[in-house]
Amino acid sequence: MAKASEHFFYVLKCSDNSYYGGYTTDVLRREAEHNAGIRCKYTKTRRPVKVIHFEKFETRSEATKAEAAFKKLSRKNKDAYLIQREEESE
């Protein structure tokens, strides 16, 4: 799915309906790692998880800034963010 030069911010929906935002260079690989319980304490106890959103960025810095901004949002604002992004992609 991704070349080494691609940078993604992604959002997972966990089995407890919580969200997890992260950074990766390969969304499918990272989703599989989360579901295998690799490299993430938060999602390890909330499996299975599913990628519900991702955005591609030119640089790692841009992607990690998007991740940090998402993580600061309240649940209500995360829901609104995801709805807005979904509407923009239609």
Swiss-Prot record:
Domain GIY-YIG: 5-80
InterPro entries according to UniProt: GIY-YIG_endonuc, GIY-YIG_endonuc_sf, UPF0213_domain
Domain of life the protein comes from: Bacteria
Pfam families assigned to the protein according to its UniProt record, in alphabetical order: GIY-YIG
Family note: Belongs to the UPF0213 family.
Protein name per the record: UPF0213 protein lmo0166
